[in-house]
Amino acid sequence: MIPVIDLKNPYALQHIEDAYTSVGFAVFTNALDTKDQTDMNCWFDEMKSFFELDQEIKNKYPYEGDTNLGYSIVGDENVDPTAPKDMKESFNYNNQRMPDHLWPTELNGFKANALQSVDIADRLTLKILSMFDEILKCGSTL
């Protein structure tokens, strides 16, 4: 069974250590504060709105393989070249090297919300790494 760890639980560090020394994997809950969770929910709604745009609009922001950024149509990607194409569409973005021509302009605030989602994810990553740092007694300052 995969451990589910509430990061707001005062014993979360012990639960993480137990999970990763026994199972090697865990699912974290309550990882974000209320504001960040609300902001991420808004971003998920924004992404849903992007994928609901007409295909011709989404095609204005094509995936660029050399940068791994942009919009990929259904059946355009697959990790395993011997397998059928993935039946999904995606929009890959980045906060540091995303060219302006790949940011959709049809949705107000799309770029700002995308950048905010990266900031939230970065802070969450540091929070979780700091927890592992404390468990392992590395003494780092993240």
Predicted regions and their residues:
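Peripheral, non-catalytic segments flanking oxidoreductase cores
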Residues: 1-142
